[in-house]
UniProtKB/Swiss-Prot annotation:
Keywords in alphabetical order: Glycosyltransferase, Transferase
EC top class, as a word: transferase
Active-site residues, Swiss-Prot/TrEMBL: 256 (proton donor)
Organism for this UniProt entry: Thermococcus onnurineus (strain NA1)
Protein name: AMP phosphorylase
Catalytic function, reaction form: AMP + phosphate = alpha-D-ribose 1,5-bisphosphate + adenine; CMP + phosphate = cytosine + alpha-D-ribose 1,5-bisphosphate; UMP + phosphate = alpha-D-ribose 1,5-bisphosphate + uracil
Length: 503
């Protein structure tokens, strides 16, 4: 059938096209049927939503579809039913526990990107990976397919370094120090980062406090070839586009298949042209990987996958049992990171981790002798060279290179929790800290978050401040206070834990 495009000023939350009920009956189309829209220039796929938002002879295009494909109001398109793609058969094959061939994986990924697969079919694929897993042949094929269906970056400055943390630790502003340290040593490090999904601040959220983070690949290439580094939001790029689609299914199902996680991370490194990749795997209670044994197994997978992609990969297993530094939330973390770069010093957990990771990269890149990377990284930080490189990054990304930490605005609604008793800090709950910061409005409210005054092992007296919540509104502050009282994020105990009498 022929139909005129009507642009709908709405997001449907899915990749849908809207057809009038009478029109759908005539065309024998049903809800969720896959259709293709053909014009002289392109073919676009979408799932049918039957709605009287559009009239007979019209097809409604939501903003979800417009984000990827250009349509004009009133443009005439041909609407045709589309049968189930071949990739559905391959998904069923994986559901049955069978190994997928390279061409089958490539077909699935291409159909995900082209939107030939509907949400339910993508969810089935993700579930099959969670239940039946992928071997390394399949993971490598999936990684390359995810990268090659998107844009690829080609930077002339070599070698190209990269670092990625699998996350889970609140306050992880480490890479805001690592990137300028590594670039100040003469290595190239184009860092793409994510925004927060379940955390209180992704690296991109923090960097955005003092610089722009959304750039095209051409703009990134220009910045990196000029100054050797960038810190940008990966979501603004068409890198491994299948990943963004499958992540939605993972979130909805609350699952994270290991093979898909490996492919998700490494496909973007492959697309960025990274030659040397350092993976940071934090371990500890309340993070994604809780034991060192789990971390070692995952490390072996990353290293093996890197070999198959032609990348040299090393893994750092790091302590993730409590927040890094003293702040959680975009603006608060930006202040702390900038202060550390300006002064060359800062909280021990932040400086130790940042110089440790940067040192490994300096050794991997051949600018520091084996075993001397951390010392060199600390010297670069303390000399002010890393801060000068950070100023260049901020300026090239459209920010003010002269900005001072105290000039970064933070929430003006605050509440401080104090120690209810004297004793020692025996635990800080990562998930609770993140939950409080998010309840306060982070990451959407840049000035929201938490400032911690204590760390595990420290002694406190009754009435000593433990942490302050920052919010941009009274309502958000009240919400965070209620959450904090319920969550009890900091545990204080005396040296005598329990007294037991005669039994």
């Amino acid at each position: 059938m022929k139909a005129k495009v009507r642009i709908l000023d709405m997001y449907s939350g899915r990749y849908s096209v809207f057809i009038n009920e009478k029109e759908a009956k005539k065309a024998k189309l049903h809800p969720d049927d896959l259709v293709k829209l053909e014009t002289g220039k392109k073919t676009v796929y979408g799932s049918v939503t039957i709605s009287n938002l559009v009239k007979e002879g019209e097809i409604g295009i939501s903003k979800d579809v417009l984000q990827l494909h250009n349509f004009s109001e009133g443009e005439v398109v041909t609407v045709l039913p589309s049968g189930a793609p071949e990739s559905v058969r391959y998904i069923k094959k994986k559901m049955n526990g069978e190994k997928l061939r390279k061409v089958e994986i490539e077909t699935i990924v291409k159909d995900i990107v082209d939107r030939k697969l509907r949400d339910i079919e993508i969810s089935s694929f993700v579930t099959a990976l969670e239940i039946n897993g992928l071997d390394m042949d399949e993971i490598a094929a999936l990684t390359i397919a995810m990268a090659e269906t998107g844009d690829m970056l080609d930077i002339d400055r070599k070698p190209i370094m990269d670092v990625h943390s699998i996350g889970g630790v609140p306050g992880n502003k480490t890479n805001i120090l690592v990137v300028p340290i590594v670039a100040a040593a003469g290595l190239t490090i184009p860092k793409t980062s994510s925004r927060a999904i379940t955390s209180a601040a992704g690296t991109a959220d923090v960097v955005e406090v003092f610089a722009e983070v959304s750039f095209s690949l051409d703009e990134i290439k220009r910045i990196v070839e000029k100054i050797g580094a960038c810190m940008v939001w990966g979501g603004a790029l068409n890198l491994a586009p299948a990943d963004d689609i499958t992540i939605k299914a993972e979130r909805a199902l609350s699952i994270d298949p290991v093979g898909l996680m490996l492919a998700s991370i490494m496909s973007k490194k492959y697309a960025m042209g990274s030659q040397y990749v350092l993976i940071d795997i934090p371990t500890g209670k309340g993070v994604k990987v809780e034991t060192v044994d789990e971390a070692r197994a995952l490390a072996r997978d990353f290293i093996e996958l890197g070999k198959r992609l032609g990348q040299y990969v090393e893994v750092a297993i790091t302590y993730g049992g409590q927040p890094i530094g003293h702040t959680v939330g975009p603006a608060l973390e930006a202040r702390e990171a900038l202060q550390a770069l300006m002064s060359g010093t800062g909280p021990g957990s932040l400086i130790e981790k940042a110089t440790g990771l940067a040192g490994i990269l300096l050794e991997m890149g051949g600018v520091a002798p084996s075993g001397m990377g951390k010392k060199m990284a600390r010297e670069i930080l303390e000399s002010g060279k890393a801060y000068q490189k950070m100023r260049e990054i901020i300026e090239e990304q459209g920010g003010n290179p002269d900005i001072k930490p105290e000039e970064i605005p933070i929430g003006d609604k605050t509440y401080t929790f104090t120690a209810p008793t004297s004793g020692y800090i025996t635990a800080i709950d990562n998930k609770a800290i993140t939950g409080i910061a998010r309840a306060a409005g982070a990451p959407e409210d840049k000035g929201a978050g938490i400032e911690l005054y204590v760390k595990v092992g420290e002694k406190v007296k009754e009435g000593d401040p433990l942490f302050t919540i920052y919010a941009e509104s009274e309502a958000r502050l009240d919400q965070a206070i209620v959450f904090a009282r319920r969550a009890e994020p900091i545990r204080i105990e005396g040296m005598v834990l329990q007294r037991i009498g005669n039994i």
